[in-house]
Amino acid sequence: MLIMSSIKIAIFASGSGTNAENIIKYFGDKSLCEVSLVLCNKKDAYVTERARQLNIPSVIFTKSQLEDSTYVDELLSEKGVEYIILAGFLLKIPERLLNKYHKRIINIHPALLPKYGGKGMHGMHVHEAIIAAGEKESGITVHVIDADYDKGETIFQAKCTIENGDTPDTLASKIHELEQRFFPEAIKNYILKTR
């Protein structure tokens, strides 16, 4: 009987880590995937505390350690990482990692790409732009990343309605609900399809 080991994934995050925590818990039984590492570029980001509470190793690194050295690459190799999940990660992934993990780096964007994507379009900036434009719907896009911001292949989208009176804050809450509900499952389905 062939026993397959779980697929190792790493989460890159820059903030509080609610999506990271949700992903870690979703794959907690380790039957398909195992979050083996959380990587963060901000020393005061709460995501590292969430990882600690869930017994997942976390490492803080600098922008230059990501861009100009093999430090991050070595951490990923040591853990046998096969897929990288970007969960609120605000730095651009260098080309060498894009090549090494070709079509195996997944991001979530808080809008329905191709609208409201690109450099500088993250978090509240996105929600403010959507409300200012008078859009009637928004949502999330889970996508594979490539060398251009928010241009990679779309894996999954989910929508929400924007009501009269919605603000960037109320829209952010709706988007967060979609992220919590759908992001882990979209990751699972993509990995099942591509592994």
Predicted regions and their residues:
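One-carbon transfer enzymes
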Residues: 1-195
